[in-house]
Amino acid sequence: MLQAAQQLMRRQGIRRLLVLSGEPDWCREQAQRLAATLPGDWPWVGENPPPGLTALPSRAVRQLLGQERLHAVFDAGQSLDVEALAALCGALRAGSWLLLLTPPWRQWPQLPDGDSLRWSDCPQPITTPHFIHHLQQHLADDSEVTIWRQDEPLTLAALPAREGWQPPDGRPTEEQQAILTALLQAESGVWVLTAARGRGKSTLAGMLVAQSPLTCWITGPSRAATEGAGEWAQGRAQFWAPDALLAQCREGDVSEVGWLLVDEAAAIPAPLLQQLIGYFPRVLLTTTVQGYEGTGRGFLLKFCAGLPSYQALSLQQPMRWAQGDALERITDNALLFNELPAWPADGQAIDYSQAEQRELCADPQRLARFYALLSSAHYRTSPLDLRRLMDAPGMHFGLAQAGQEVVGAVWLAEEGGLSAELAHDVWAGRRRPRGNLVAQSLAAHGGQWWAPTLRSRRITRIATLPALRRQGIARQLVERQRSQAQGLDFLSVSFGYTEPLWRFWQSCGFELVRIGSKPEASSGCYTAMAILPLSEQGEALRHAAHKHLARDWPWLRQRIELTLAIPGDDGDTSLGEEDWRELAGFAFAHRPLEASLGALQRLLLASSLPLSALRGHLQRRQSPAACVEQAGVSGQKALLRYWRHETAQALEQLNAQHCRYWRDWAQSLQ
């Protein structure tokens, strides 16, 4: 049955989805039997494939980027990794069947999903009824998806009539040729090519290499991701891993290289990409419009907006399959990959509202618009975000709407409410429970051990429609969250620090309480955290956390490349009770050195002991490697123990009784 349908699918250039819904043994047995009737690659994504089929763990499916397979099985019986599912769909060539194995149809929404451990911040798998109902609805509504339930006969959905498909013949399409002609004539510049999966981005890059008289280098998130370009390049382009390429640019001569081609550029850390671009006269960046490699429109808005100039290019016509492919359609619809058309601002009044998960998920059109707006503003969006939005506990949403259009969106996550005992363990570095990003960070790195006991909501994402930016919509969304909050101590936000972003949060009433010590890999920005107090306890936390940051800032800024003034430091370098607590946490518990930096610097000013290892690193700025050698210890773990030992010595020498008190507190489980 599948074989006859597959011949027509190949002629039409499409792929199809067959859902097998039933008990695990039945699903495996039917999948094995069906695979035996059709020659193909048949990777089995999931655990325990039947004999003769090759297991491919879901975490390894990304390795198929830029590659092609014929037919596949995706076992979603215990765990549904939608990132892996999307990646697998993108790797299947025309004429392929994808078999999706699911639990019994009616039971599925009530069953725990093992994949939820990756995104729900829960210690055990949770049920995910909103997303599963959403997926089931899309599967049932698509006329070309076949759903085969256990104890029912297999009846394939009919294939609509389509014109015959002409697979690529090695020559560029009209779209590709127009872009190639422009690139081959280029003297210099940056070009950004965005397209959906299977549109021939990598093929075009390879054709450029093959036809250009210039030396071309290729980089990408992995060598496998650039295989498509490499095949067309006929061995003329050298592949470099991004970090190795940057090292080569810094240390060697790259003046003979005429083109740098960056495949799936949105998957490469922005600061690294920014530096690479500056070394080459011509750069072609390719990135996927929507999906698991990054969001193309968000990439254009965020990364490319920071370039002096660039030219945007796009490909619309599929290459690996025909226009209107059945598998691409169901994947795009179910995972909300379709970017919504630009909305013309028409002067409609804007209404603000709150929405809880159940309410938002019950309105598919509003959900799609809400998610599309957030995706367009954050190019690191992945299908995990959709799953978290729909089913993770503690999610809350605010919307700004003009008619039916969502023009502003804010997404918040509950944090805090931990017991004092657990909060103390977080402060001491003994435990790091899932979630609670800002609340835990203020305890683990900001010195406020009690912060996780307070109740708060963290703004995880906020976005407004580009046509309506700078009209106060985002600020109004935040104000609505502040005014309608009940039983909360504060709102928080964690963001990559830039002056414009901080000005926005400051205008909303937030105050800085923490700056990370290292730039984020994805953005190159330092993580900043800020809070907006809503209660007396929240105000006390704001005051204490900001004072802690301001007091430590003179030493922190020596390690952080930010031109930022943080008022509030009174210049007092004597050891206070908060310093004793911090130092005891470092000396007698497991707090990291970076979290205790200011207190350690003040300790060195107060102590008359040599403390050679601490002074070498903190006052003379010796590297950890130099400190290891000077201290005669066996490595960085031993060096950390030595630093802790020196700190304990200094505390004991300053005030033995006080030292014992704070040692007992740091080691207690109160």
Regions found by a protein language model. Name each.
Residues 240-251, 271-272, 278-379, 417-455, ...:
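Terminal substrate-recognition subdomain of acyl/acetyltransferases
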Residues 52-87, 237-278:
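Conserved RecA-like ASCE ATPase "motif II neighborhood" in helicase/translocase motors
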Residues 1-5, 167-187:
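N-terminal pre-P-loop "Q-motif" helix
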Residues 61-158:
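N-terminal accessory nucleic-acid engagement/regulatory domains that precede
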